Amino acid sequence: MSKEKFERTKPHVNVGTIGHVDHGKTTLTAAITTVLAKTYGGSARAFDQIDNAPEEKARGITINTSHVEYDTPARHYAHVDCPGHADYVKNMITGAAQMDGAILVVAATDGPMPQTREHILLGRQVGVPYIIVFLNKCDMVDDEELLELVEMEVRELLSQYDFPGDDTPVIRGSALKALEGDAEWEAKIIELAEALDSYIPQPERAIDRPFLLPIEDVFSISGRGTVVTGRVERGIVKVGEEVEIVGIIDTIKTTCTGVEMFRKLLDEGRAGENVGVLLRGTKRDDVQRGQVLAKPGSIKPHTKFESEVYILSKDEGGRHTPFFKGYRPQFYFRTTDVTGTIELPEGVEMVMPGDNVNMVVNLIAPIAMDDGLRFAIREGGRTVGAGVVAKVIE
C-alpha cells in the first residue's frame, strides 16, 4: 500500500483511551500509532515516549497528558492518553482534552474493573458522545466462552450508563502483540481504526453551530450606541441580524448593527475571532460582563444544575480542608463569577481536597448554559475546583 502524504484537508477528530489502570491504554496508544504509520504513513510513537506524559495546566489544574496524532485514509486523529487515574478525572472534567469519542480499553484477563465503571460514568456525565471497546490481552485467553462473557459484561456496563451497549463496536485484540509486529494482531488495530472512522460521526465544527459570544467588555460610543467585545465561541454573527443578550438579568432582544475587528469594519464575526459588536438601541447599563450574545432562542439562562466536579488538592494550590453542604463559593462561567450553594449526594457528608464528586448547584443569578458547559469553582479569586454541567435542572 502506498504511503499517502499527510494533508491538512482531512477531517479532524479528537479521541482518547480510557479504562482501568494496567489494562493496556498506553500500549494500545503506541500500537495504534505504530500499525497505522506502517500501513498508511505517519510517525510511530514508542510506549515510553507516551508514558512520560508532560504536565499541562488547564484552568489552574496540573494534568499529565500525552498527545499523539495518527491518520487513517479518511481522517486525521488527535489522541490523548493519561498516565494516572486522577489525570483522567481532571482531564474529562476540565475538558482540557475534549473527546469526540473514546476507546475504552478492557483487559480480557480481568474483565471490567472499578475504574472501567468510573470512566464510563464520567464519560456519560461530561458528554463523551461515543465509546468503542478494545478488549485487550486476548492472546492470553484461550477460552472463547470467557471472551464472550467479558464482552457481555462490558456491553451491560455501557448500557447501564445509557450508552448503546448492544450496538457498540467491540474489537478483540492484543496491543502488545500488535506492537511487536504480529500480523494477526496488527489486523485488529486496523479493525479498531476502521471502527473509529465509521462509528464516530464527524463532529460539528464550531463555526456551524448557533452563534454565541461571551461578553468580556461593554463600551458606549456616543452617537453610535453600545459595543460589546469578546471572542466568538461558535457560529457567525452578521450585520443586521437579531441577537439576544442572555444571563444575569432578563433576556433582551437587540440587533447587531456593526462588527469590527482591529478597528476595521466587517460584515460578520466568526468563531474564534475577537470582535466588537455594535448593538442597536441597547443602553450601556443593559449589558454586563458575564452575559452572552447569542442567536435568538439558541440558549437559555439557568440557575440550578447537576454537575461533576473535581476539587483541587492542597498540593495543587486548592483548599487545605474539606467542605460540607451549604458551602457557598463562586462559580466562574466563561467571563464572570456567580455565587452559588451546593447540595451533596445522599450519604456524602463532606468533600476532601483531591476528590471528585457529583453535586447540584444553585446559583443566585442565572447564567446562559447548556449541558457540557465547563466552569471553575473559586474562593476570593483563587481556583479551588473545576466542574462541568452534567444536566440543567431549572
Curated annotation (Swiss-Prot):
Segments of this protein annotated with the region G5: 174-176
Residue ranges of the TM segments: none
Subcellular location as annotated: Cytoplasm
Binding site residues for GTP: 19-26, 81-85, 136-139
GO BP term (any one): translational elongation
Region: G1, residue numbers: 19-26
Region feature G4, mapped onto this chain: 136-139
A GO cellular component entry from the record: cytoplasm
Pfam family, one: GTP_EFTU_D3
Binding residue positions for Mg(2+): 26
Segments forming domain tr-type G: 10-204
UniProt entry keywords in alphabetical sequence: Cytoplasm, Elongation factor, GTP-binding, Hydrolase, Magnesium, Metal-binding, Nucleotide-binding, Protein biosynthesis
Enzyme class per UniProt: hydrolase
Region (G2): 60-64
One GO MF term: guanosine tetraphosphate binding
Region (G3): 81-84
InterPro entries the record matches: EF-Tu_GTP-bd, EF-Tu_GTPase, EFTu-like_2, EFTU_2, G_TR_CS, P-loop_NTPase, Small_GTP-bd, T_Tr_GTP-bd_dom
Entry function: GTP hydrolase that promotes the GTP-dependent binding of aminoacyl-tRNA to the A-site of ribosomes during protein biosynthesis.
Xref: PANTHER family: ELONGATION FACTOR TU, MITOCHONDRIAL, ELONGATION FACTOR TU-RELATED
Protein name: Elongation factor Tu-B
Species of origin: Yersinia pestis
Organism classification: Bacteria, Pseudomonadati, Pseudomonadota, Gammaproteobacteria, Enterobacterales
